[in-house]
């Protein structure tokens, strides 16, 4: 029997990506994809951050950046998507489409997005309610409401 992965350590990778995105002038949303190996160790597959502002690509959310960086995988069912913020509907659709079974969320206080739909589909959704994720996103939204609304598709 394997022990539970250290989700907070996994979130630390996504948080580092979120900080990078913020430093680049973008939204502070990061993601990382991991695989739990047969022996219980956790391997980082990829990482990414929201680069919508930096590259002018409205589809380049944190989860999609990490997904693209993962390249082709034979299966996504045994991978864990870790994100600093609850996935929006677009990213939740990607998670569903490719069959991820576990999603670790840094926070859903500032935005719950498609979290509930993922739970309803039977995915293992782990919300860590991380204080740094909550504060970073709250402060960003307060300082950049127009950019934030654009990111989640609100006019």
Residue ranges and their predicted role:
Residues 22-26:
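Short loop/turn motifs at secondary-structure junctions and domain boundaries
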Residues 28, 80-84, 104:
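Conserved beta-strand segments that form the floor/walls of ligand-binding pockets within enzyme
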Residues 45-48:
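A structural microfeature
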Residues 51-54:
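A short acidic/small-residue loop/turn micro-motif
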């Amino acid at each position: 029997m394997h022990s539970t992965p250290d989700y907070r350590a996994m979130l630390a990778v996504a948080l580092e990506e979120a900080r990078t995105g913020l430093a680049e002038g973008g939204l502070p949303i990061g993601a990382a994809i991991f695989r739990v190996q047969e022996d219980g160790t956790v391997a980082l597959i990829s990482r990414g951050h929201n680069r919508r502002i930096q590259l002018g690509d409205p589809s380049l959310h944190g989860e999609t950046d990490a997904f693209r960086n993962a390249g082709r995988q034979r299966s996504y069912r045994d991978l864990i998507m870790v994100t600093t913020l609850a996935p929006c509907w677009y990213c939740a659709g990607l998670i569903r489409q490719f069959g991820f079974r576990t999603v670790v969320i840094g926070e859903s206080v500032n935005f719950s997005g498609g979290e509930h739909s993922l739970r309803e589909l039977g995915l293992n959704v782990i919300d860590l309610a991380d204080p740094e994720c909550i504060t970073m996103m709250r402060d960003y939204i307060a300082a950049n409401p127009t950019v934030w609304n654009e990111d989640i598709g609100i006019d």
